[in-house]
């Protein structure tokens, strides 16, 4: 403490965190220095912590957008607030990592009430039919095949179907009352299919990604409200 006081402008006071060892006792006695005062708790206090102010985010944004925001701000935690700025919870990198582990439930997107706009944004795609502000609330996610018989047997009403460019396959999915069709690899969709989708209130999303990439990325479109921490938060005003 004496040396630090000589080297800098700040004031230091000698303290000890436990019993004095024999070696330290010898040095203190030799130089006739009083024993440093004992400190029983060296835990950090709020005044010792550097606080970074981070703007709150909506609970409706996608996991992908939350992750991109974390990387941009170089943080591992984001506060989630409502429209009035009141804290609803926090989302951390662990929460996002956990969401990637739930890959065996093909209805997880509808259970999370995922907005089609989020899905298109996550897939870097465009919504060319249907209401982008609507939500996927029922059904499962299906990777379609070119076999029309398979589609008729496997696709159920309200399902979300990932398809290729085949017009007849897209029409069969619409006839099966799919709620959303995702067309990959940047393929264009026939105007007849778009018109039919609008009549059936079916959303069509086109994306440059291939089928594998779509299936891998699509879960990142879920809203963070399903994964954020809401309880046991210690909060305070500053």
Please annotate each region the language model reported.
Residues 21-22, 44-45, 188-194, 211-215:
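Short gly/pro/ser/thr-enriched loop/turn and capping motifs at secondary-structure boundaries
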Residues 22-31, 194-199, 218-220:
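Active-site-proximal loop->helix
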Residues 37-69, 81, 87, 116-129, ...:
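Bateman/CBS regulatory modules and CBS-like beta-alpha motifs in cytosolic regions of diverse proteins
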Residues 93-109:
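A short, polar/charged loop-to-alpha-helix boundary motif
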Residues 106, 199-229:
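Long, charge-dense
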Residues 134-198, 202-207:
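Extracellular/luminal Protease-associated
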């Amino acid at each position: 403490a004496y040396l630090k006081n000589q080297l800098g402008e700040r004031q230091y006071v000698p303290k000890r965190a436990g019993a004095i060892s024999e070696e330290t006792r010898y040095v203190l006695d030799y130089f006739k220095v009083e024993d440093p005062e004992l400190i029983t708790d060296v835990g950090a206090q709020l005044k010792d912590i550097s606080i970074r102010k981070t703007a709150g985010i909506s609970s409706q944004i996608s996991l992908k957008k939350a992750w991109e925001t974390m990387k941009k701000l170089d943080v591992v935690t984001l506060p989630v607030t409502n429209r009035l700025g009141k804290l609803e919870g926090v989302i951390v990198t662990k929460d996002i990592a956990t969401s990637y582990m739930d890959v065996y439930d093909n209805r997880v997107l509808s259970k999370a009430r995922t907005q089609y706009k989020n899905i298109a944004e996550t897939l870097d795609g465009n919504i060319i039919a249907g209401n982008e502000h609507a939500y996927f609330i029922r059904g499962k996610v299906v990777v379609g095949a070119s076999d029309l018989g398979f589609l008729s047997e496997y696709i159920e009403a309200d399902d979300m179907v990932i398809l290729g460019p085949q017009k007849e396959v897209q029409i069969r999915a619409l006839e099966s009352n799919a709620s959303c069709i995702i067309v990959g690899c940047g393929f264009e969709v026939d105007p007849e299919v778009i018109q039919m989708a609008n009549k059936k209130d079916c959303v069509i999303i086109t994306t440059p990604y291939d089928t594998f990439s779509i299936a891998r990325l699509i879960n990142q479109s879920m809203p963070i409200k399903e994964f954020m921490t809401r309880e046991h938060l210690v909060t305070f005003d500053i």
